[in-house]
Amino acid sequence: MQYAKISGTGSYLPANRVSNDDLAQKVDTSDEWITARTGIKFRHIAAENEKTSDLAAEAARRALADAKLNINDIDLIIVATATPDMQFPSTATIVQQKLGITNGCPAFDVQAVCAGFMYALTTANAYIKSGMAKNALVIGAETFSRIVDWNDRTTCVLFGDGAGAVVLSASDKPGIIHSKLKADGNYLKLLNVPGQIACGKVSGSPYISMDGPGVFKFAVKMLSKIADDVIEEAGYTAEQIDWIVPHQANRRIIESTAKHLGLSMDKVVLTVQDHGNTSAASIPLALDAGIRSGQIKRGQNLLLEGIGGGFAWGAVLLQY
């Protein structure tokens, strides 16, 4: 049986590390307030000349090195991002150019905000299982600092920039076991960026608009359900999960999912305190951190899950 297995991971964080105390000098907030409600202590912010594609390309280089593959071994590139370099072309094609990949492989973006990496990974899995690709580069990359209102203390404290990447390779050994994606556009008012470009003009606010309590309530409910669904549909039990690698948005949401599954927080890869919410980048960033720290080991079962504006959400059960 053909599987898609992670053969390499990599990540990149901008050099500028911003603490809660740093933000408290700019808006009416405090380290205690932010930490108690979110678990976030730090976030990284891209330099003025750093684009989403720059972060993505560096994470990709590290993933390729980890997989011990050459650039032209890659035959599919998918970038999950809600903050592309430009309206078009896709950030994936820009990354393709920056990496020097010249084999003409397909490259495209996926936009499902914080669930984007789940959507991208599931798409790459389908390519590999169908025989359409052998080595896929799957990247989550964001520069959310560009769409945050730095005068709004309810949102500016939450987000950070970064990129994470995996190389997904064809294998006869188990890799991605099961995945499930969901969406419901009826909740778009809870979390969105209302601004839009039309006829050369920008209309509406270009910054994140969020109903925090509404997002929290929906996320807790849907993440618990999709985690149950993926585990059950795969014929597994929660006890067989070695690590949860969740979207790193809010520690309380993460704790709720772990509690629902009956799993200790000792089985959760947690990076929200260091990265903040990096949207589509958060899961691959956490995955790479867990692997490089020695927490995650080959052969272990991982549950990846996340939810983003739309709403769009998803979960992937895989063997590393």
Swiss-Prot record:
InterPro entries: ACP_syn_III_C, ACP_syn_III_N, FabH, Thiolase-like. Keywords: Acyltransferase, Cytoplasm, Fatty acid biosynthesis, Fatty acid metabolism, Lipid biosynthesis, Lipid metabolism, Multifunctional enzyme, Transferase. Its main location: cytoplasm. Pfam families: ACP_syn_III, ACP_syn_III_C. Pathway: Lipid metabolism; fatty acid biosynthesis. The active site is at C114, H247, N277. The keyword Isomerase does not apply. GO terms for molecular function: 3-oxoacyl-[acyl-carrier-protein] synthase activity; beta-ketoacyl-acyl-carrier-protein synthase III activity. GO terms for biological process: fatty acid biosynthetic process. NCBIfam families: fabH, PRK09352.1. The last Arg residue of the ACP-binding site is essential for the weak association between ACP/AcpP and FabH. Belongs to the thiolase-like superfamily. FabH family. Catalyzes the condensation reaction of fatty acid synthesis by the addition to an acyl acceptor of two carbons from malonyl-ACP. Catalyzes the first condensation reaction which initiates fatty acid synthesis and may therefore play a role in governing the total rate of fatty acid production. Possesses both acetoacetyl-ACP synthase and acetyl transacylase activities. Its substrate specificity determines the biosynthesis of branched-chain and/or straight-chain of fatty acids. This is Beta-ketoacyl-[acyl-carrier-protein] synthase III.
